Amino acid sequence: DIYTTVKTGAALYLIPHTLFSWPIRLLEYLDRNQINTIFWVPSAMILLSKLKALDKMDLNGKLRTILFAGEVMPNKHLNVWRQHIPDAVYANLYGPTEITVDCTYYIVDREFADEEPLPIGRNLPNTDILILNGDDQQAENGEIGELCVRGTSLAKGYYHNPEKTREAFVQNPLNPYYTELIYRTGDLVRTNELGEILYVGRKDFQIKHRGHRIELGEIE
């Protein structure tokens, strides 16, 4: 978030967390400071759509780029945003911390029914996406497999946790010729008829809440 504003010569606003408890004040803050781009977790956007805050203020033409990542974005709530701010560009970004930090993107370019899944799109530059089935082979189109990432953005591993590092950062099973690490995300995905990646779920019992990972086993 910081580097993109530096690169484009934009001003970076750190919105006070308390404003997310007051949706109208939050929108007034965006309007007052002439903010034209936001990069939020879907939870924040869902809150505003549920409380119908977008009915109270017209930001169309002012808010021009709306990016979101960290959780699944339901089209039911995204459609509310698109109805109220139709001129904005919407982009769904995906990527775990281990690949610092986004590896796929989807610019919303068509209409979706409320119950349809929103694609996480295609790989970003310098990143390649592998979808591996249960036999560690490339999944066929439409077949569910684990999303794995290779490229220049991979982390070195987990700090002081070599065992977990060895489990998640592994040799690419599709490359028997030389050392090439990939990161196994644990996320299950498939591709649609357009070649776009769709998120299906998790291999384990990890969930996301407000963009933060939670291991249900650790709570138990």
What does each model-found stretch correspond to?
Residues 24-27, 55, 220:
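Short hydrophobic/charged patches on amphipathic alpha-helices used for structural packing
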Residues 1-36:
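Conserved AMP-binding/adenylation subdomain of ANL enzymes
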Residues 1-2, 25-26, 78-80, 102-106, ...:
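Short aromatic-enriched loop/helix-cap "lid" or pocket-rim segments at secondary-structure transitions
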Residues 16, 41, 69, 104, ...:
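A secondary-structure boundary/capping signal
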Residues 43-45, 73, 154:
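Alpha-helix capping/helix-boundary segments
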Residues 25, 43, 67, 218:
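Ca2+-coordinating acidic residues in Ca2+-binding motifs
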Residues 89-92, 107-220:
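AMP-dependent adenylate-forming
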Residues 3, 7-10, 35-39, 49-119, ...:
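Gly/Ser/Thr-rich phosphate-binding loop
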